[in-house]
């Protein structure tokens, strides 16, 4: 994720310069500053070693992309920005942060491991609840019903759409989801407890529903947004299956392929 994002950012940045100058957009310096900050936050998420660092830069990414979403400063952009912040900040503060605190209380650490850290540290009966807090706390993964921020954010300038779809935002969300499934819960723990079975159904429903919605959208950006949500759900589904083959397939193949195609 980090390598692909840093590579695609080069082309996205070059395009954004031409777009901003060609359309004579206002506040270009502010735009470039927050654009660079967003990519930096995404890379910090990619290389985070613990949940605290992950959460901090997850929030930095949210706040740095808000001025980009609302760049046009019209009523539609402001409305989209309010929805963007309310869903992403609300979900992370209300659900993601308490979930991280729960992990810290249970394990005594915020470090992550390739085999997970919760096996033997948490009551199996509470594992689905903790997973649900993580899943719905990671609003950037855009699972239903917390997906509406992405179609709304398409009012942003085209370079921001590339940032949202390919370079940083949604990929940071689904990458965080995979990290939680593999490095916090662990594939073996999920398979043994069945804690992610409900997530399989949710991801499957999301990918089917949003694919159908995308077909009936005439606006190209709206169709792209719902198509992106569908593809993100494929990645989440692969992680929720709790097998090494599925996890490797979505992390090494589908995640990178979707980043490149959306760009």
Regions found by a protein language model. Give the residues of each.
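Short phosphate-coordinating micro-motif centered on Lys-Gly-acidic
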Residues: 59
